[in-house]
Amino acid sequence: DRPLLGWLHRSPAEAPPRVTGLVICNPFGYEALCSHRSLRHFAEATAGLGYPSLRFDYDGTGDSAGEDLDPDRWEAWQQSVGYAIDELRRSSGVTDVCLLGVRLGATIAALAAAGRGDVAALACIAPVVNGRAWLREIRALQATMGRAEPPPEFALPEGVTESVGLLLAEEARESITRVDLAAITATPAPACLVLDRDDRPPNAAWCAQLRELGAAVDQHVLPGFVE
């Protein structure tokens, strides 16, 4: 076990007591940079309503222990969500937890929550349902930013790629490639909110699978995602 850095947003004394808290699962790379301030404000606002909120850095990312290229990244990121849930319950006294995930963070949250009995709800913003498609997307975005290859003085180790601020070893890419949320066999939470991108078809297959597994699913399109 390695320490993770987290930010616990406690509810003010005058807020009504709640039994549910929020864990925020941020995206990665450039997407994490773009969403950081909004997620911090959301955590603060949620805590102000009486729901303690926890933000954290996954294992090997940000200020948490470990490195980008450590082995077993996919499993470690999912374990990080579990640790965050446990820490929020321990630190705040809540009994139930809601997860809010953005992009790949939503994917990790969904997989980490499956099989737990203390995740009351899952909210996904533009979730990555197919890992292979997401890898293609971030490679294309890297190319459009004029950074298809790093300069020679910053050459990457063999088998390592860098896309929009995210370093991935071959093992991590292979793990992400196998991700298909539409094939999950356990529901992550009794209630799921899915906010799809407005520039892509809705994630109908995944939502149908969630309903088949017994989850109540509320699905909407999030306007202005690309902007």
Spans of model-derived segments:
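The alpha/beta-hydrolase serine catalytic core
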Residues: D72, D96, R116-E227
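Alpha/beta-hydrolase fold nucleophile elbow
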Residues: S91-R103
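Active-site loop/turn elements of alpha/beta-hydrolase fold enzymes
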Residues: Y51, F56-T61, P127, L222-G224
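Gly/Ala-rich beta-loop-alpha elbow adjacent to hydrolase catalytic centers
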Residues: L100-A110, A126
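Short, surface-exposed "cap/lid" segments of acyl-processing enzymes
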Residues: S11-D57
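Glycine-rich "HGGG/HGxG" loop immediately N-terminal to the catalytic nucleophile
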Residues: F56-D72
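A short loop-to-beta-strand scaffold at the N-terminal edge of the catalytic core in hydrolase folds
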Residues: D1-A13
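Alpha/beta-hydrolase active-site loop
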Residues: S38, L69-S91
